[in-house]
């Protein structure tokens, strides 16, 4: 049980770091992401995850930023994805910063609660996994989202896009934690 409490604290700390960055970017850009249609958001997630995988394989970054900031971006874009699923996309920035932060906090809390339930059932299995596995699982979730989008959301037995966003967020938080330890 002590490990699960440690995980909860680390998860909350990682989300707090992501939130602080999100809030600063919101100040700089407002909620410009409101314009993103679902497929563009999926492609943005893909770009971030693909870069992580590329850096893991090449062991070198010519841009200078490493893997950890990309996991943070995946967390924030995953939460943006949940907001967009909830609110729909817009043609203009139609949300003030306060509302954006309220929604951010709502979905971050949902991700935390989901992690707690899954971590209980899976008994801290994430701690024994490699960071590269998180990357591959995230890429798999993105491919699933693409297929669900191609099907117009009409799945037979699969979880929806929201569940895949939640899993992306959780795997990315685990990546941030592992790269912080």
Label each PLM-derived region with a short phrase.
Residues 1-181:
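Intrinsically disordered, low-complexity regulatory regions
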């Amino acid at each position: 049980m002590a490990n699960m409490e440690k995980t909860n604290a680390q998860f909350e700390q990682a989300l707090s770091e992501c939130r602080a960055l999100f809030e600063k970017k919101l100040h700089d850009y407002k909620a410009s992401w409101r314009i993103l249609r679902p497929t563009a958001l999926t492609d943005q997630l893909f770009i971030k995850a693909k870069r992580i995988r590329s850096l893991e394989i090449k062991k070198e970054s010519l841009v200078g930023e490493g893997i950890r900031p990309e996991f943070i971006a995946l967390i924030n874009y995953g939460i943006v994805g949940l907001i967009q699923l909830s609110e729909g996309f817009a043609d203009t920035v139609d949300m003030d910063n306060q509302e954006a932060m309220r929604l951010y906090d709502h979905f971050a809390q949902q991700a935390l609660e989901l992690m707690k339930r899954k971590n209980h059932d899976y008994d801290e299995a994430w701690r024994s996994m490699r960071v590269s596995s998180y990357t591959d699982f995230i890429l798999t979730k993105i491919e699933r989202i693409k297929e669900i989008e191609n099907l117009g959301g009409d799945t037979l037995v699969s979880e929806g896009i929201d569940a895949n966003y939640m899993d992306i967020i959780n795997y990315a938080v685990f990546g941030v934690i592992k790269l912080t330890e």
